Curated annotation (Swiss-Prot):
To T.molitor cuticular protein LPCP29 C-terminal region. This is Antidiuretic factor A. GO terms for cellular component: extracellular region. GO terms for molecular function: neuropeptide hormone activity. The lineage of its organism: Eukaryota, Metazoa, Ecdysozoa, Arthropoda, Hexapoda. Keywords: Hormone, Neuropeptide, Secreted. It is found in: Secreted. It comes from the Eukaryota. GO terms for biological process: neuropeptide signaling pathway. Strong inhibitor of fluid secretion by the Malpighian tubules. Uses cGMP as a second messenger and inhibits fluid production by decreasing cAMP concentration. Reduces isosmotic fluid secretion by inhibiting electroneutral and non-conductive transport pathways. Reverses the stimulatory effect of diuretic hormone I. Its main location: secreted.
Length: 14
């Protein structure tokens, strides 16, 4: 899952 721009919580999964 990549970071979601415009979302309340943007997260990165490595």
């Amino acid at each position: 899952v990549v970071n979601t721009p415009g979302h309340a919580v943007s997260y990165h999964v490595y």
